[in-house]
Swiss-Prot record:
Database matches in Pfam families: PALP
Database matches in InterPro entries: D_Ser_am_lyase (IPR011780), Ser/Thr_Dehydratase (IPR050147), Ser/Thr_deHydtase_PyrdxlP-BS (IPR000634), TrpB-like_PALP (IPR001926), TrpB-like_PALP_sf (IPR036052)
Membership in a protein family: Belongs to the serine/threonine dehydratase family. DsdA subfamily.
Key words, A-Z: Lyase, Pyridoxal phosphate
Gene (UniProt): dsdA
GO biological process: D-serine catabolic process; isoleucine biosynthetic process
Keyword RNA-binding belongs to the record: no
Modified residues (N6-(pyridoxal phosphate)lysine): K118
Protein name as it appears in the record: Probable D-serine dehydratase
Known EC number: 4.3.1.18
Gene3D superfamilies: 3.40.50.1100
Amino acid sequence: MTGKSPEVIPHTPVVQDLRAAREIFWINPHYRATKEFKEAQFGISLSDIHDAEERLRRFAPYLAKAFPETQPAQGLIESPIVPIKRMQSYLESRYGVQIPGDIWLKCDHQLPISGSIKARGGIYEVLKHAEETLIKQGLLTREDDYARLKDSSFRDVLSHYKIAVGSTGNLGLSIGVMGAELGFKVTVHMSADAKGWKKALLRSKGVEVIEYTSDYSKAVEEGRRQAEGDSRCHFIDDENSRDLFLGYAVAGLRLKEQLEKLNRKVDADHPLFVYLPCGVGGGPGGVTFGLKQVFQEHVHCFFAEPTHSPCMVLGLATGLHDGIAVQDIGLDNKTEADGLAVGRASRFVGKIMAGLLSGAFTVEDAELFRLLQALDHAEGIQCEPSALAGMAGPARLLLCKEGLQYIREHRLEEGLKRGTHLIWATGGSLVPVEVMKDYLSRGK
């Protein structure tokens, strides 16, 4: 992460709209509907994703013992996909557009252990670090039954090691809960945007929470700096972590299985459109990478960001990646979507997404609350504000000339009628009842 402001900021129409905090829909001019992925291009391959999936399966017996809520899925951390027909009708009415195809919800707000998409990457990296530490000490082999890790002797060993992370909330929750359960001493550096209940939950698990009055980037920077001087401290770097990225990418393999079980095809005649909330980029970037590996040119991924924190679309649209922050164009990086309150995108993720991401759009906070309330009313599903960022995606795609041009260019007009729109809901099941009541009241 450079942390530097650019000397010259491009004055393109999209940057001007972002500067004015207007809602935009941006199509990536560098998107390539490629069938092939060269490992040298990304430094990450499909075999790396399979390796991550195998590691999660090795840990499944342990997770089933440590977290009973994972037992229905035999210790796998996974969420269902559900059709949301009533919400689709609401979106068509609200935005005044017919949406061909079916809208489904990917329920990562229900993920066990930490209740958000961050359970995928955050928990994976903690598990990998624990495995490597114990194997190095000769206390574990990959052939062992990992259920034995619940034994207190392993906790005693890992209690001599530390894990640190910078977070706006959900990543810290997933790493804190998992790390503390394994016995690690965990420190979460939290930005000013982090919700009080998330800090309280972490502290109740014995996690050290260090609060900052500044934003996410500062929390990460401080966490990284403090960890550098301690050889026993593993810093989980949300801006640059390959392991976090791979943990998220496993979702691509899992989604393929889920869609097959539901007899929902993904091919040239049945395109898949996926709408993902985006903060620094690791979660949606990893998921997108996994999806593109599995479905190739038949999946079309779009990131959704708050109008006041559009760091990824700003980095991609200017080509500056982490060389520009939203503050450089006069935005305050203040949003109720705490998981998306990031001013400077990950360069690591931005570079990989440069040719894989179909586009991105921004959403006003007030609209997030309206959609949050509507989802509860239509489907009885409750999510936190960040999780609603992608909800308007199918309508927004069809309402702008750029989106319609994208559909024509990729010959999707007919396929769209048989296609699937998947809204990725990123968090919400751990939100306290009183906080959720407040969210719902703000959407009326």
